[in-house]
Amino acid sequence: MEFSASLRDNKVMRWSVLAITSLTLFASYFFTDVLSPLEDMLIRDLHWDGSQYGFFSGQYSFLNIIGFIILGGVILDRLGIRRTGLWFTILMLLGASVKYYALTSYFNNGGFGYDFFNSFWVDFKPSVKLASLGFMIFGLGSEMAGITLTKVVVKWFKGKELALAMGLQVSVSRIGTAAVFVIAPAFAKTGGLTSPVIFGLALIFIGLLSFIVYMIYDLKLDNQVQGLLAGEEEIFRWSDMTKVVANRGFVYISMLCVLFYACVFPFLKFATNLMINKYGVSSDIAGEIVFILPFGTVLLTPIIGYFIDRKGKGASIMILGSILLVLVHLVFAFLPGNIYFALGGMFILGVAFSLVPSALWPAVPKIVPDQYLGSAFAMIFWVQNIGLWLFPMLIGSVREWSNPGVSAALQEGKDVLFDYTAPMFMLVLVGVVALLFAILLRKADASKGYGLELPNERK
């Protein structure tokens, strides 16, 4: 169905909408990784260890993996973009505030709630438990806000520059991730551990205000089209789940998604520490090396998306990106601690992280019929969050297992280093499985005719 002339037909207006909502997305991704370059400070100042840090990092996805993200999808379908986006952006702010409070000296010196969080699970610090609670609340709000913002892009760009707009949206999220590895260490050096966290909290508040501004334009658009847009949106039905999971191509692309992303985002939470321990650089330099990955994706993702939109080859591009992923983690696992290997590895990982997402997300509508698309995206995000929850804990646990006594020595102020061979080799194995699913997806495309190798044209 074509939309009647409306605000969305005004090129300046729809790109302005993308810019406004991108502030919310930027804030979400910045705050998600704000502590990633600061693990050494968490160990030294708050006496966390690798397992506790890994546990905390994984809690971002906990509420999502137990089904709340699917419930959120139902809420989005039932209540629409405005109310859903507002509620979950507020939830982001709430979770971020709890996480910040858990890291403050007031709380850790016996402030409100300390005794309660110290009364159970005594092997973990109270700050770990409260920060994890805040992070899981934030994670639910962040993921649902992200899905809502994706729906915003579809609403305003359908039939127009949709692929480019989605590519730019991905780029904004990568800028948010990249900024952490430059800004957070600098802020922490001058203002302490909580300084970059409160900066991220301020960004979340600005993102909330930005979404409120967007709501005004969204209401105007709905009034103009008189329900045409709402009429095209699919209502989530539980019965759709069985039809979706019976689709072999959907299973392959979902597994590729969870395994590929599990080798990137959880890795980033340990990447700064890897650079410090294996390559012998300072925390500032380590953050700048890690910055290469998201910065590279900012530039490459829209370009690759533009290419796929017009030339196709999506399935082949996913295979290529998966091969690069395996090679990168082999470099980090086994090659010597030469800084040039670190620089080259992060650059190639950035290329891989541009190739696969650029091809993966536009492929979903080719594999899944339109009437099940809402259910499909909810399930993919759900499976992806399982990986984002599980793998930080796995990486942290494998690192602790392969480095007995190192965290304890660091807490005592001793000059010791982590060996990252074992956790990186684990990611190599995960990457190999991701590559196998990319190959299976290419074969399924050849037999089922999904059109993944064809340009991204609407069916």
Give the ranges of each region predicted by the language model.
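Central cavity-lining transmembrane alpha-helices of secondary-active solute carriers
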Residues: 58-74, 291-304
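Flexible cytoplasmic inter-helical loops of multi-pass small-molecule transporters
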Residues: 215-240, 447-457
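C-terminal transmembrane helical hairpin of 12-TM major facilitator-type secondary transporters
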Residues: 314-360
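Extracytoplasmic gate region of multi-pass secondary transporters
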Residues: 35-39, 247-301, 391-395
